[in-house]
């Protein structure tokens, strides 16, 4: 609701001294980035929670094992990627508020400080990233990646025909191919130098999380 400046595309609130900051493109960019991370993160958590229920309650032993395999793959992503996303989201929240975001008046700075500890406890994100790339991807011979990739392909086939979804589905398909190439390249590099896994793990986790 804060009034500050005028919209580049023209005055939006002529009866007021200035326009709300939400009309400014950069503010909208930051808000939409936060929205994407928060809503996407919730869906990822819901998906993981559903698989946990399936692993405990599904009467089919094969289905329970499939859920356990998926949980093992998703856990370092949920912990590692979403905690880094929390830092970015809260940092953007401070930025949206400007100087008032940095002081205690709004409470936003407390959210940012609270988020900062999350990449550290319960296994640092570096450890989570090593778990993902070293154990869940390379350690399974790529089976875990193939499992999640197959699910993504099924979703693309299922929803790709919807006009409003088609561009996103096509882009997701490209990202899936890039992920496969990235993993293959890292696998070759790691054979020559195992330290490549540790050096690339955190960035790899971020790529997979996105």
Where would I find each of the regions flagged by the language model?
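Flavin-dependent oxidoreductase catalytic core characteristic
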Residues: 1-210
